[in-house]
Amino acid sequence: MKILNIHKTVSADQLLKLLQQKLNPSFKQQRQSDVIFTIENKRSFVEISQPDLYEGFLFRIEIKGTELLITRSEHYVDDVNSLTLESILNSLFEELADDGRVTLVLEG
């Protein structure tokens, strides 16, 4: 799990909207691939998956105050699509953050 502080409180709906608008287009641009990810609000977290290629989720993001608790599926840590998604997510979290400030609280 990785915990990031974005120094700003956001709702799951705000996070979901940003990811739905920008994640797939950014992925297509970076990987030159037509893979489309499913981004869903699952009540207590936002989940990113791609059921045609991967069993289960790729990322789960839970919001706790100003922190984002990010769980990455242990089955796909070395997968190139998962690594690309992580890079894009980090950029989008900067966009979401207060003044672009993202602080790593925990990575493990």
Language-model segments: residues:
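Polar/charged, Gly/Pro-rich intrinsically disordered segments
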Residues: I6, S44-I63
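A conserved amphipathic terminal alpha-helix motif
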Residues: D78-G108
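Short secondary-structure junctions
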Residues: P25-R31, D52-Y54, A97-R101
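Intrinsically disordered, low-complexity regulatory segments enriched in Ser/Thr/Pro
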Residues: E55-L83
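Generic N-terminal initiation segments characterized by hydrophobic and/or small/turn-forming residues
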Residues: D13-L16, G56, L89, F93
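Negatively charged, low-complexity tracts enriched in Asp/Glu with abundant Ser/Thr
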Residues: M1-E47
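Short, low-complexity, polar/charged sequence segments that are solvent-exposed and flexible
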Residues: K22-S26, G65-L68, I88-L92
